A protein has these predicted regions:
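Gly/Pro-rich, tryptophan- and cysteine-flecked surface segments typical
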Residues: 1-200
């Protein structure tokens, strides 16, 4: 059983359940709610969850993988962001703690040079910060690189960036705990053919 506010959905053993327009389902709404939030999915059994953010104009989907409570940390690295050409970056930072705190957000170039910084941004208990156009909101453009988010005051955080275009295409980059790097990693798939290429 998966519990949501006022909702309980049964997922078959080894199966999958898709909930279309989940925001409307949770609020018993028949039309657009205008709500922005993060979702918590809780279950009696171990689960994996993902969401597809679908552009209502182009029907273009972007996949977003869930993060567990254990993914929270005090320093998070979002591997990529961009404000160059047609690409923009939205950023969301979630406070997983039941008390308020602050975060400092830093963007660095590929050479490690600081190119943007937001100091001591307040974030409520179990709340979130959302920047629809992170760099545009700072008056910056023509840059790209990783984003670091540092939690202050003992809170645990997660962060995700979405690189997107006004035409509707987009992709998610989920933050990782900076302290959990590895000396060897595996990329599950790489392709180089007439239809696709792989950048690393």
């Amino acid at each position: 059983e998966i519990a949501a506010p006022g909702k309980q959905i049964t997922v078959p053993a080894y199966g999958m359940t898709q909930i279309n327009n989940v925001g409307r389902v949770l609020e018993d709404a028949s039309s657009i709610t205008g709500r922005e939030a993060y979702l918590i999915v809780e279950s009696e059994q171990e689960i994996r969850a993902w969401a597809s953010q679908i552009d209502n104009l182009t029907e273009d989907p972007s996949m977003e993988r869930s993060q567990s409570d254990a993914d929270g940390s005090q320093r998070v690295l979002v591997p990529s962001s961009a404000a160059i050409g047609q690409f923009l970056t939205s950023l969301i930072v979630i406070n997983q703690s039941d008390f308020a705190g602050q975060v400092t957000i830093r963007s660095r170039s590929n050479a490690g040079v600081l190119q943007a910084e937001l100091l001591n941004q307040s974030i409520e208990a179990n709340g979130f910060l959302h920047f629809a156009d992170f760099y545009g909101g700072l008056g910056l453009s023509n840059l790209y690189g990783p984003i670091e988010v540092e939690a202050l005051g003992g809170i645990q955080i997660t962060a995700t960036a979405r690189i997107y275009t006004q035409e509707g295409s987009s992709g998610y980059f989920q933050g990782v705990d900076i302290s959990k790097g590895s000396k060897k990693v595996v990329m599950p798939f790489s392709v180089d053919n007439d239809d696709f290429r792989t950048n690393l």
